[in-house]
């Protein structure tokens, strides 16, 4: 039985979507068990304990923006969920709680993979090509970075793509404001030079990539400092939502456009579904000794479903064991 520890207290939408997604996941995956960590009085409004849903009663949640020193000094639903993995009572931890607190607790309790200085947040993105995705790391865990972080993340991302997507030599690039070697900050330039000269067997390093090119499907792994990566993440999320609204407004503005929209309705629906970030559901805390996934604070049931599906693929591909072996 594979066990997931799920901190259900951090979601903006309450515990409901998290619990309902958990129920549906274990119904469809009979070899999985989920430990729901949170306020039992809230959780039991949706589900009672059974052989594959267990409840740990810990109502105290980490508040967004809470002082890290205070977070680390007390017991919360987030810390309990991570402790379950640390104590080998679960294999995976999932939370939609405060990002900074989650990262800090994961690093302190689960420890870093050997050779990794700073873990990163790593979401998976769709591209304009069917069945083609890429990972972007970091997207906010490390605002200030050193050259070695970018080099390490390139290796982490390439190993992830190799394991999860069965790509022999993933295409890797560093996010920058231009593709020329002299562009960017010193750490961009140095990491670019190191990766070019290293000619590593686990990746096909292609140099710098500009933000406008990341959705074309030419890269499997894109490395960024946390500040730039977070801007890209939020820009992409916002663009998809706003573009969908724009299309809907334009195609329903006249009678004839509405007729055309009916013909194209299926295509529009497929595009929207293809670009819906909820299908992925979360970002990895990549670089720690266990599978740790951070769901978006605004996650609904569909987003949690996406996170569970991502976790299932990772567990069944023995991602952490492969990381340790390859790195």
Swiss-Prot record:
Pathway: Lipid metabolism; phospholipid metabolism. Gene3D superfamilies: Isopropylmalate Dehydrogenase (3.40.718.10). Keywords: Cytoplasm, Lipid biosynthesis, Lipid metabolism, Phospholipid biosynthesis, Phospholipid metabolism, Transferase. Its EC number is 2.3.1.274. It is found in: Cytoplasm. The keyword Cytoplasm applies. It holds the Pfam family FA_synthesis. The keyword Repeat does not apply. GO terms for biological process: fatty acid biosynthetic process; phospholipid biosynthetic process. Coiled coil: none annotated. GO terms for molecular function: phosphate:acyl-[acyl carrier protein] acyltransferase activity. It catalyses: a fatty acyl-[ACP] + phosphate = an acyl phosphate + holo-[ACP]. Catalyzes the reversible formation of acyl-phosphate (acyl-PO(4)) from acyl-[acyl-carrier-protein] (acyl-ACP). This enzyme utilizes acyl-ACP as fatty acyl donor, but not acyl-CoA. Belongs to the PlsX family. This is Phosphate acyltransferase.
């Amino acid at each position: 039985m594979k066990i997931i520890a799920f901190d259900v207290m951090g979601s903006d939408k309450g515990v409901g979507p998290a619990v309902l997604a958990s129920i549906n996941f274990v119904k469809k995956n009979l070899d999985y068990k989920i430990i729901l960590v949170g306020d039992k009085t809230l959780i039991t409004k949706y589900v009672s304990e059974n052989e594959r849903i267990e409840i740990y009663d810990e109502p105290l949640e980490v508040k967004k923006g809470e002082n890290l020193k205070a977070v680390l000094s007390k017991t919360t639903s987030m810390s309990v969920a991570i402790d379950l993995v640390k104590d080998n009572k679960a294999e995976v931890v999932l939370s939609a709680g405060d990002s900074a607190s989650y990262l800090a607790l994961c690093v302190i309790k689960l420890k870093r993979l050997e050779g990794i200085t700073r873990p990163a947040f790593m979401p998976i993105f769709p591209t304009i090509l069917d069945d083609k995705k890429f990972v972007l790391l970091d997207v906010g865990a490390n605002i200030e970075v050193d050259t070695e972080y970018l080099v390490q993340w390139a290796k982490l991302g390439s190993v992830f793509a190799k394991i999860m997507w069965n790509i022999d030599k993933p295409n890797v690039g560093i996010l920058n404001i231009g593709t020329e070697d002299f562009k960017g900050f010193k750490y961009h330039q140095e990491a670019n030079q190191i990766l070019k000269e290293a000619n590593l067997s686990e990746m096909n390093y292609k140099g710098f990539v500009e933000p406008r090119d990341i959705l074309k499907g030419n890269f499997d792994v894109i490395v960024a400092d946390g500040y730039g990566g977070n801007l890209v993440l939020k820009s992409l999320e916002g663009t998809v939502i706003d573009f969908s609204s724009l299309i809907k407004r334009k195609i329903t503005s006249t009678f004839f456009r509405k007729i055309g929209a009916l013909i194209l309705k299926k295509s529009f629906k497929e595009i929207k579904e293809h670009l819906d970030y909820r299908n992925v559901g979360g970002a990895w805390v990549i670089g720690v000794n266990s599978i740790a996934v951070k769901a978006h604070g605004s996650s609904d049931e569909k987003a949690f479903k996406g996170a569970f599906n991502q976790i299932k693929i990772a567990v069944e591909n023995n991602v952490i064991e492969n990381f340790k072996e390859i790195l």
